[in-house]
C-alpha cells in the first residue's frame, strides 16, 4: 500500500474536454398592446416632480443661511478697530430692538397657542343638536337640557393653565439660544452686551432713533440693500415651489399668528420678484423641527468650523437662489395683507361717513408696523366713538320712554277729566231742564196767585168810594181827563189763569178765604203796571236774603220761602201826618201845591230809607204840630243834604251843570216831599174815618194802628175838633187831583209807546227819563205810583209850571225804572222804591222782572 497522495482532481495530461455549448433560445418580441391598458396615465407630471422635490428639500436652509451671515458679520465687526466697535454695538442693539422683541413675543404666542390646543384635546367634543321634541303645554323647562361642564375643566383651569404660563417666555430655551450662539468668549461677551442693550425701553429707543441714530440707520439700510442687489445680479431666480396638500393648507389656516411671526423674521425688501406663500405655510407647520435643527447647529461648533467652505458655497450658489425670492414673497404677502387692512378701513370710514385717509407708503418692516399700528389705533378710536354713540342712543331712548310714559299719563288724566266733565254736563243739563220745568210751573202758579191773592182786597170799598167821588169831580173840572180808576187785569193774565185752574197747578197755593164783599187784587192795578218787561242786566243775585217786598209776597204765596220782616215805618208816618193835615189850614192853592210837593218827595224818600234811616225820617214828623212856616223851614233844612246826594239819580243820571239849577232842584224836591207826606197823612186819616169798623189784615197792620193811635192822642190833641164836612171836601179834592195825575201819567205812557223807538243800551247803568215802547222790543215800563195812592201826588201838576215839570220828570223816571213794587204783607199799601238804591242793587245782584213777557 502506498502513502503517496495522488491529486485526482488535477488535469489529465493529454486529455482535453470540450465544453458543452448551450443553445440560446431566440425570444420573440411581442408588440405593445394598447388595448389592454395605458400606463402613461400613471406617469408623474412635471408639476408632481417639482412638488416632490420641494417636499424633500430642507426647510431650514434660509434661516441657517441668515444666521450664518449674521455670525460672519459679527466676526468681521470684531476684527475691526475698537473705536468702531461701539458704533457697531449700537447698530446691532438697534436691530435687536427692532427684531428680537417681536420674535420673543411671537414665540410666547406660539407656545400659548399650542398649550390651548393641547387643553382643548382633553375635553370631549360636543356638537349642537336640534331634537324634534314636542314640549308639554304646561312645562316651564325647555326641551334641551344643558349639561354642566365636567369637573376636569375646572381642575385643569386651576392646576395646568395659569395666567402667567400663556405669556411668559421659557427661560431655559432662551438661555440655550443665547449661550450657544457664539464660537468664542468674545462672541459670548458680544451677545451679552447685545442682550443687555436690547432690554432698553421703547421710549429710549425712539428717542435714540430720532436724535442720534438717524444717520446710522440710513447707512445700515443702504448697505443691506446694496448686498441684496449684488446677490440678485449674481444668481438667477430659483424655481417656485408648488402648492401644499389640502390637509396642510387646512392646518395652516389656524396658524396665522405663526405665519406673521415668521414673515417678520425675514429680511425686508431683498428682491422684487414674487414667490408663492406655500413656503411660509410649510415653515410654520414645521416650526418645531426648525428650532430643533437650529439648536443642533449651535451645539456643534466644530462641525460648523469644518464646514466653512461648504457654507460659503451655500451662500454663493443655492442659498442665493432661494433666499431673495422667498423673502420677497413673504414681504409681498405682508404688504398685501396690510393693503387689505387699509382698504377695509377705508370702506368702513366711507360707510360711517368719516374722513377717509389714503394708503401710507410702507418701506420695510418699520413701515408695515407703523401702518398696522395706525390702523389699529383708528379702529380702536372708531369702536370707542361707536360705543359712546350707542350709550347716547340708549340714554336718549330711556328719556323718550320716560317722556312717552308721562304723555300717556297726561292723556289718561285728560281722558278721565273729559269723561267727568261730560257726566257733569249731562247732570247739569238734566238739572237745568228740571229747573226750567219747575220755573214754568211756578210762573203759572204765580200768575194764578196774583189773580186770587187777597192782599189788598180790603181797599175795594175805598176805591169804590173814591171812584164815586172823583167821577163828579172829573166831569166838572175842565182839565181832568176821563179815566176810569178801576183798571182791570190785562187780557193776557186772564187767558193764562183761565188755562190753568187750581186743580191742575203743580204747586198747591195757600187758599185764604176772601170775604164776599171784597173784589180781586189784580183788578185794583192799572193797566200800565202789567206791562211786559225785559231783563236789561244779567242775573247776578249773590244772596237770597235781599228781595223786594213784592217778591217776598209772591214767594210766600207759592210756598217757597217766608218773606222778610217789614218795618211799619210808612204806616206810622202816614197816620201821624193825618192829624197834621187836619190841623193845617187850607187857604190857598199855592200853599196846598207846595205842601203836596213837599209831602210827595218826603213820602217817596221815607219809603226807601229802611232800617238805617228810620230815626232820620221820624225826626221831622214830631215837629209837624208847629205852624206851616216852621215845618217848611225845618223840613227843607233836614232834607237838603240828603237830596244833594241823590240829585243825579232823581234826574235820571244827568249831572247838573249850574248852581242855579242845583238850588232850584233842591227846593222843588223839598216841596214835593212835604206835599207827599201831607197827602199820605190825610189819606191814612181818611181811611180810619171811613172804615171805623177796622180793616182785615195781619198783625202788623193792627200793631201799626195801635202805635198810630197812641201817637195821635199824644201829639195831635187839637184834631178832635175838625168837622166831617171839611174832611169830605178835602178828600174829594185829593181824589180829583190824583185822578188828574193818573190821567196825565197814562198820556205820557201812551206817548212813549207811540213815539219813542230809540232803545238804550241794555247794560247802561243810567235810566233814561222817557223810555220808548214798542210791542216787538219787549220794554219794561213800570210806574212807581200805584193805583190806590197815585191821586194824592198829582197836585204838583195843577198849581205851578215848575211843580208840573218836576212831577212829569219824577213820574217819567219812576215809570221807566225796573224795580218792583214795595208791598207790606196784608195791608195792601204799595210805595215806590228809591231809584238810587234800585240801580245799585241791579249793578250788584241783577234783577228779574216779574211781569209777563209779550210774545
From Swiss-Prot:
Keywords: Cell cycle, Cell division, Coiled coil, Cytoplasm, Cytoskeleton, Mitosis, Phosphoprotein
GO cellular component: centriole; centrosome; cytoplasm; spindle
Segments passing through the bilayer: none
Keyword Glycoprotein belongs to the record: no
Chief place where the protein resides: cytoplasm
A Pfam family per the record: SPICE
Modified residues (Phosphothreonine): 235
Location of Phosphoserine modifications: 640, 644, 760, 764, 819
Name under which the protein is recorded: Spindle and centriole-associated protein 1
Organism: Pongo abelii (Sumatran orangutan)
Amino acid at each position: 500500500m502506498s502513502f503517496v497522495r495522488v491529486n485526482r482532481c488535477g488535469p489529465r495530461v493529454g486529455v482535453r474536454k470540450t465544453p458543452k455549448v448551450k443553445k440560446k433560445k431566440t425570444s420573440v418580441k411581442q408588440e405593445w398592446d394598447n388595448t389592454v391598458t395605458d400606463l402613461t396615465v400613471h406617469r408623474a407630471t412635471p408639476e408632481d416632480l417639482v412638488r416632490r422635490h420641494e417636499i424633500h428639500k430642507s426647510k431650514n436652509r434660509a434661516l441657517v443661511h441668515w444666521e450664518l451671515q449674521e455670525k460672519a458679520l459679527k466676526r468681521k465687526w470684531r476684527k475691526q478697530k475698537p473705536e468702531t466697535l461701539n458704533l457697531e454695538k449700537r447698530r446691532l442693539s438697534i436691530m435687536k430692538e427692532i427684531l428680537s422683541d417681536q420674535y420673543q413675543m411671537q414665540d410666547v404666542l406660539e407656545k400659548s397657542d399650542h398649550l390651548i390646543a393641547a387643553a382643548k384635546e382633553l375635553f370631549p367634543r360636543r356638537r349642537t343638536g336640534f331634537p324634534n321634541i314636542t314640549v308639554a303645554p304646561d312645562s316651564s323647562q325647555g326641551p334641551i337640557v344643558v349639561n354642566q361642564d365636567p369637573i376636569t375643566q375646572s381642575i385643569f383651569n386651576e392646576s395646568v393653565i395659569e395666567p402667567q404660563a400663556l405669556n411668559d417666555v421659557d427661560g431655559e430655551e432662551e438661555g440655550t439660544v443665547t449661550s450657544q450662539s457664539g464660537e468664542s468668549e468674545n462672541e459670548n461677551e458680544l451677545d451679552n452686551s447685545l442682550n443687555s442693550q436690547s432690554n432698553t425701553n421703547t421710549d429710549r429707543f425712539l428717542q435714540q432713533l430720532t436724535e442720534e441714530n438717524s444717520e446710522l440707520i440710513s447707512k445700515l439700510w443702504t448697505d443691506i440693500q446694496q448686498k441684496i442687489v449684488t446677490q440678485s445680479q449674481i444668481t438667477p431666480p430659483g424655481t417656485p415651489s408648488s402648492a401644499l396638500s389640502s390637509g396642510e393648507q387646512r392646518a395652516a389656516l389656524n396658524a396665522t399668528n405663526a405665519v406673521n411671526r415668521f414673515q417678520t423674521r425675514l429680511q425686508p425688501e431683498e428682491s422684487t420678484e414674487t414667490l408663492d406663500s406655500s413656503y411660509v405655510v410649510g415653515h410654520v407647520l414645521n416650526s418645531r423641527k426648525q428650532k430643533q435643527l437650529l439648536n443642533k447647529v449651535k451645539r456643534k461648533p466644530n462641525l460648523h468650523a469644518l464646514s466653512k467652505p461648504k457654507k460659503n458655497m451655500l451662500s454663493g450658489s443655492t442659498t442665493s437662489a432661494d433666499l431673495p425670492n422667498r423673502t420677497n414673497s413673504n414681504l409681498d404677502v405682508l404688504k398685501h395683507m396690510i393693503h387689505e387692512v387699509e382698504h377695509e378701513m377705508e370702506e368702513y370710514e366711507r360707510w360711517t361717513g368719516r374722513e377717509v385717509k389714503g394708503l401710507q407708503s410702507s418701506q420695510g418692516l418699520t413701515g408695515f408696523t407703523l401702518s398696522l399700528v395706525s390702523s389699529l389705533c383708528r379702529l380702536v378710536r372708531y369702536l370707542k366713538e361707536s360705543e359712546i354713540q350707542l350709550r347716547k342712543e340708549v340714554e336718549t331712548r330711556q328719556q323718550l320712554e320716560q317722556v312717552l310714559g308721562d304723555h300717556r299719563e297726561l292723556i289718561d288724566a285728560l281722558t278721565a277729566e273729559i269723561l267727568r266733565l261730560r257726566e257733569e254736563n249731562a247732570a247739569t243739563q238734566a238739572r237745568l231742564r228740571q229747573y226750567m220745568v219747575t220755573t214754568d210751573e211756578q210762573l203759572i202758579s204765580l200768575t194764578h196767585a196774583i189773580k186770587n191773592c187777597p192782599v189788598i182786597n180790603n181797599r175795594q170799598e175805598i176805591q169804590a168810594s173814591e171812584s164815586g167821588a172823583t167821577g163828579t169831580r172829573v166831569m166838572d173840572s175842565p182839565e181832568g181827563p176821563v179815566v176810569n180808576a178801576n183798571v182791570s187785569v190785562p187780557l193776557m193774565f186772564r187767558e193764562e189763569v183761565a188755562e190753568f185752574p187750581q186743580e191742575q197747578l203743580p204747586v198747591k197755593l195757600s187758599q185764604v178765604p176772601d170775604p164776599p164783599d171784597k173784589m180781586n187784587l189784580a183788578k185794583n192795578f192799572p193797566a200800565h203796571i202789567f206791562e211786559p218787561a225785559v231783563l236789561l242786566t244779567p242775573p247776578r243775585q249773590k244772596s237770597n236774603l235781599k228781595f223786594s217786598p213784592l217778591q217776598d209776597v209772591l214767594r210766600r204765596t207759592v210756598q217757597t220761602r217766608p218773606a222778610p220782616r217789614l218795618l211799619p215805618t210808612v204806616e206810622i208816618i202816614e197816620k201821624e201826618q193825618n192829624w197834621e193835615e187836619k190841623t193845617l189850614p187850607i187857604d190857598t192853592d199855592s200853599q196846598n201845591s207846595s205842601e203836596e210837593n213837599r209831602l210827595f218827595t218826603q213820602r217817596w224818600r221815607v219809603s226807601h230809607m229802611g232800617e238805617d234811616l228810620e230815626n232820620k225820617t221820624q225826626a221831622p214828623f214830631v215837629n209837624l204840630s208847629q205852624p206851616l212856616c216852621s215845618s217848611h223851614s225845618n223840613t227843607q233844612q233836614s232834607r237838603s243834604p240828603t237830596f244833594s246826594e241823590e240829585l243825579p239819580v232823581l234826574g235820571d243820571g244827568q249831572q247838573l251843570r249850574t248852581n242855579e239849577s242845583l238850588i232850584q232842584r233842591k227846593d222843588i224836591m223839598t216841596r214835593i216831599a212835604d206835599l207827599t207826606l201831607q197827602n199820605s197823612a190825610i189819606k191814612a186819616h181818611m181811611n180810619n174815618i171811613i172804615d171805623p169798623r177796622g180793616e182785615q189784615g195781619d198783625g202788623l197792620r193792627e200793631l201799626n194802628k195801635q202805635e198810630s193811635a197812641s201817637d195821635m192822642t199824644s201829639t195831635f190833641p187839637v184834631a178832635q175838633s175838625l168837622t166831617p164836612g171839611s174832611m169830605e171836601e178835602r178828600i174829594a179834592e185829593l181824589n180829583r187831583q190824583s185822578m188828574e195825575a193818573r190821567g196825565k201819567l197814562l198820556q205820557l205812557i201812551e206817548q212813549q209807546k207811540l213815539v219813542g223807538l230809540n232803545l238804550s243800551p241794555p247794560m247802561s247803568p243810567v235810566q233814561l227819563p222817557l223810555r220808548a215802547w214798542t210791542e216787538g222790543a219787549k220794554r219794561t215800563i213800570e210806574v212807581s205810583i200805584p193805583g190806590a195812592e197815585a191821586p194824592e201826588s198829582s197836585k204838583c201838576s195843577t198849581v205851578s209850571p215848575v211843580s208840573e215839570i218836576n212831577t212829569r220828570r219824577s213820574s217819567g223816571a219812576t215809570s221807566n225804572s225796573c224795580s218792583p213794587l214795595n208791598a207790606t204783607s196784608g195791608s195792601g199799601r204799595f210805595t215806590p222804591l228809591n231809584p238810587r238804591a234800585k240801580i245799585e242793587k241791579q249793578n250788584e245782584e241783577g234783577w228779574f222782572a216779574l211781569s209777563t213777557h209779550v210774545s
